[in-house]
Swiss-Prot record:
Positions bound to adenosylcob(III)alamin: 130-136, 185-192, 219-223, 239-244
Signal peptide range: none
Keyword Metal-binding in annotation: yes
Pfam families for this protein: B12-binding, OAM_dimer
One biological process term in Gene Ontology: L-lysine catabolic process to acetate
Protein name, as recorded: Lysine 5,6-aminomutase beta subunit
Pathway annotation: Amino-acid degradation; L-lysine degradation via acetate pathway
Keyword annotations from UniProtKB, A to Z: Cobalamin, Cobalt, Isomerase, Metal-binding, Pyridoxal phosphate
Cofactor: adenosylcob(III)alamin; pyridoxal 5'-phosphate
Record-listed N6-(pyridoxal phosphate)lysine modification sites: 144
Catalytic activity: (3S)-3,6-diaminohexanoate = (3S,5S)-3,5-diaminohexanoate; D-lysine = (2R,5S)-2,5-diaminohexanoate
Length: 263
């Protein structure tokens, strides 16, 4: 079921790119076109479609249209809405704590360890708290890695331990002490109701209570993890989508050398 996707109304846009006023791009610069999807707790019918349109208008959409709607069951429906927004942001004023590292591949990391470390580097990773997902930590830790990027278990000079999922923070720290970890890698996939914020904060507090926080490299990762967020929560770095084991390894190794932790 769809509704009114196309309009014959002529619209003119300033097609000049202005980084102080950037808008979403559909097929014309500054047209502000946006696609959004959501679920409503109502039946999929004409009334449900109108509810979706009214919500889109209240969100600032101009001339919204329901491109797709589908019943999930008798009392829930799914919608894809197209529209345009007149809002813009000043791209030049945005400040972020982006990780600026010259990523080394696996072989370069191994050579870096050989030249700068007199021992193996111990990296311990897990999905901690109640998070039962391992896809993120496996992509970084497991030998086969992900998307052509081998995991830390394959790196010569690295002793990598993947503790899996649903590891209590207390057990994670206990294992880190036992293994004499240089770096802890925490993956958080479940983020509903900001449960990941609470769990990540709890880990930092426990490490500080044990007097370990300044003695290790602490990394957070996940689909909704940014470096800004990780730093704010007390981590050394955060890695989100599109990052691989070589990115993580490069940061850890160079940070250890900078802190004099490589002896």
């Amino acid at each position: 079921m769809s509704s009114g996707l196309y309009s014959t109304e002529k619209r003119d846009f300033d097609t000049t790119l202005d980084l102080t006023q950037i808008r979403p791009y559909g097929d014309t610069m500054n047209d502000g076109k946006v696609q959004m999807s959501f679920t409503l707790p109502v039946a999929c019918n004409e009334k449900g479609i109108e509810a979706a349109l009214q919500l889109a208008r209240k969100m600032g959409f101009v001339n919204p249209a329901v491109a797709f709607s589908e019943a999930l069951d008798k009392e829930f429906s799914f919608y894809v809405v197209y529209g345009a927004t007149s809002f813009s942001v000043d791209y030049t004023a945005i400040k972020v704590q982006a990780l600026e590292i010259d990523t080394m591949d696996m072989h370069e990391c191994e050579k870096y360890i050989e030249e700068n470390f007199g021992r193996e580097v111990v990296m311990v990773g897990a999905s901690t708290g109640t998070d039962a997902h391992t896809v993120g930590i496996d992509a970084i830790m497991n030998m086969k890695g992900y998307a052509g990027h081998y995991g830390l278990e394959r790196y010569k000079g690295v002793r990598a331990y993947n503790l899996g999922s649903q590891v209590p923070n207390e057990e994670f720290i206990k294992k880190a002490i036992e293994l004499k970890a240089d770096a802890l890698l925490v993956s958080q996939t479940v983020t509903q109701k900001d449960v990941h914020i609470e769990n990540l904060t709890n880990l930092v507090e426990l490490l500080e209570a044990e007097g370990l926080r300044d003695k290790i490299i602490l990394i957070a990762g996940g689909a909704r993890i940014t470096n800004d967020l990780a730093k704010e929560l007390g981590y050394d770095a955060g890695f989100g989508p599109g990052k691989y084991a070589d990115d993580v390894a490069t940061f850890i190794l160079k940070e250890m050398v900078q802190r004099g932790m490589n002896k």
